[in-house]
Curated annotation (Swiss-Prot):
Keywords: Nucleus, Transcription, Transcription regulation, Translation regulation. It comes from Candida dubliniensis (strain CD36 / ATCC MYA-646 / CBS 7987 / NCPF 3949 / NRRL Y-17841). This is Enhancer of translation termination 1. It is found in: Nucleus. Belongs to the ETT1 family. Pfam families: Nro1 (PF12753). Required for correct translation termination and probably involved in regulation of hypoxic gene expression. Residues 233-252 have a biased composition (Acidic residues). Its main location: nucleus. Residues 1-41, 227-256 are annotated as: Disordered. The keyword Transcription regulation applies. GO terms for biological process: positive regulation of SREBP signaling pathway; regulation of translation. InterPro entries: Nro1/ETT1. It comes from the Eukaryota.
Length: 420
């Protein structure tokens, strides 16, 4: 599998922006109400059940922009209160979901203090201690295992990777980051194993669980782009010339750098692909699994195959059509024929998943299918039946999408008609 061809993090972040600097000093007028928080809980929450209320408060946070530190502190204070009350009144042990919410809230605090490494460490230490306490009382609880995986991935990003520079050395860390990542992925594998053991795959019918795979992809994307001048800068000048972009992408890490092993290994990209496939398999075992979630997983798989096809696709089109490469037999270790066959196989796989990701209410998903068809058509001989059939089908899809969106996809349609 080609190195870091699965980079879906940027697309995912466009849907779900993780804000790091959101807690700012309020004005004098606002400060008087800063310690007051009124939350309207979902209707289905039992007002007489304190754990149910805690779950409702947590759900409110999850469905928000997740930029309110006051709400996170509210969760923690409520957990502290329930814990004290439970200890005082000698009630039955608190359920696993309590420990999961408590640990998650503690870890979330780190995102509001990313410039204060000591606090980040403190929050993650407390979060992991809480989740381990929960697991001691509820061994192999699947919700707690999911929570632990998510916290560990966040810890890798914020505590271990965020402070690094190009000059960082593995000797500066108490643990090697690839070892931490291996241990974290092992916890997630225990989630999969536990679901299989219980024959209950409902844990996967939740975008919060799918976030684990997105968080891993985010980490791999950060590692792949580590050291680039505009890394993580969404406001960078889009008019930078291509030569400068190429120079930025060529940043090399020393063998002693904490991210060197991850950056120079294919295994984490392959792990992401394999376990995303397994995620989809587990979803399909549910009678009433979320259609939206299935489409999202299929979309990610389709995009991953498209991205993996980029290098062989470029090799094929260059060797076949670029006069400057006349007489050259190979590029990137591939002949024209090999590049063509590999690209056709990958884009065909991508099309299968993109079709399964199609949403009748979202023309963007239709256009994704059409664009993949055009790419596949480009890999066949000019004016061949295979190419013509793919172009004709893509044109139908683009015309339909263009009509229902009042011309939003006119450029894509015009480009295809120009090819024809």
């Amino acid at each position: 599998m080609a190195k870091r061809t699965l980079g879906l993090a940027k697309a995912a972040k466009a849907k779900k922006q993780k804000k790091e600097q959101v807690h700012q000093e309020s004005s004098d007028e606002e400060s008087s109400s800063e310690n007051q928080l009124t939350i309207e809980l979902p209707e289905e929450i039992d007002a007489n059940d304190e754990i149910s209320q805690l779950k409702g408060l947590h759900k409110t946070y999850l469905e928000s922009e997740r930029d309110n530190e006051l709400l996170v502190n509210g969760l923690i204070h409520e957990c502290d209160r329930l814990l004290r009350e439970n200890d005082t009144e000698n009630k039955s042990p608190l359920p696993p979901v309590f420990h999961a919410i408590y640990a998650t809230a503690l870890a979330e605090l780190s995102k509001f203090h990313t410039e204060e490494l000591d606090k980040v460490k403190e929050y993650f230490t407390a979060a992991l201690e809480r989740v381990e306490l929960g697991l001691q009382q509820n061994p192999n609880d699947i919700t707690l295992l999911v929570t632990k995986t998510k916290i560990l991935l966040d810890q890798i990003s914020l505590q271990y990777i965020a402070p690094l520079t190009l000059e960082s050395d593995t000797k500066e860390l108490d643990r090697e980051i690839d070892e931490l990542l291996d241990a974290t992925l092992s916890v997630y594998e225990s989630v999969e194993a536990r679901a299989k053991e219980l024959n209950d795959y409902s844990i996967f019918d939740d975008f919060e669980t799918l976030d684990i795979l997105e968080a891993l992809d985010d980490i791999l994307d950060i590692v792949d782009n580590f050291g680039r001048k505009n890394q993580g800068d969404d406001d960078s000048d889009e008019n930078d010339d291509d030569d400068e972009d190429e120079e930025e992408e060529s940043v090399e890490l020393s063998e002693n750098h904490p991210l060197y092993k991850i950056k120079n290994s294919d295994k984490y990209d392959q792990w992401w692909r394999d376990h995303t496939h397994l995620y989809l398999d587990n979803l399909e075992k549910l009678e009433n699994g979320s259609s939206e979630l299935k489409r999202e997983v299929c979309q990610r798989l389709g995009q991953s195959y498209l991205q993996e096809s980029e290098v062989p696709y470029s090799v094929f089109t260059t060797l076949k059509y670029d006069d400057e490469y006349d007489g050259i037999e190979e590029l990137e270790g591939l002949t024209e024929k090999q590049a063509q066959e590999i690209s056709q196989e990958l884009i065909t796989k991508a099309l299968d998943y993109l079709k399964r990701a199609k949403d009748e209410e979202d023309p963007e998903t239709w256009v994704g299918i059409a664009e993949a068809m055009i790419s596949l058509g480009n890999l066949y001989e000019v004016d061949s039946k295979q190419q013509d059939d793919l172009y004709v089908e893509a044109e139908k899809i683009l015309k339909k999408a263009n009509n229902v969106t009042n011309g939003k996809f006119k450029e894509e349609l015009d480009n295809l008609l120009y090819k024809e």
